[in-house]
UniProtKB/Swiss-Prot annotation:
InterPro entries: Acyl_CoA_acyltransferase. Keywords: Plasmid, Transposable element. It comes from the Bacteria. This is Uncharacterized protein in sul1 3'region. SUPFAM superfamilies: Acyl-CoA N-acyltransferases (Nat). It comes from Escherichia coli.
């Protein structure tokens, strides 16, 4: 990501799901390689991400390189 370019943060859409799942798998692999426990990668699939997209709870940060981050916002602790 170009440090001069601020990321664009928006509510994710269904077209973002595959990229979000890939990003989360990459992040989990990176954390695991550093010895940090990560998410249960088996749970992170299209269905998992789609649940948050359908409720408009998944936000993505993107730049010209694509999606560079994501987070969920919800009223309740899942």
């Amino acid at each position: 990501m170009d440090s001069e370019e601020p990321p664009n943060v928006r509510v994710a859409c269904s077209g973002d799901i595959d990229e979000v799942v890939r990003l989360m798998h990459d992040a989990a692999a990176w954390m695991s390689a550093k010895g940090t426990p990560a998410w249960d990668v088996a749970r992170i699939d299209r269905t998992f991400a789609e649940t948050f997209v359908l409720r408009s709870e998944l936000l993505v940060a993107s730049c010209s390189d694509g999606i560079v981050g994501c987070c969920t916002l919800s009223a309740e602790d899942p």
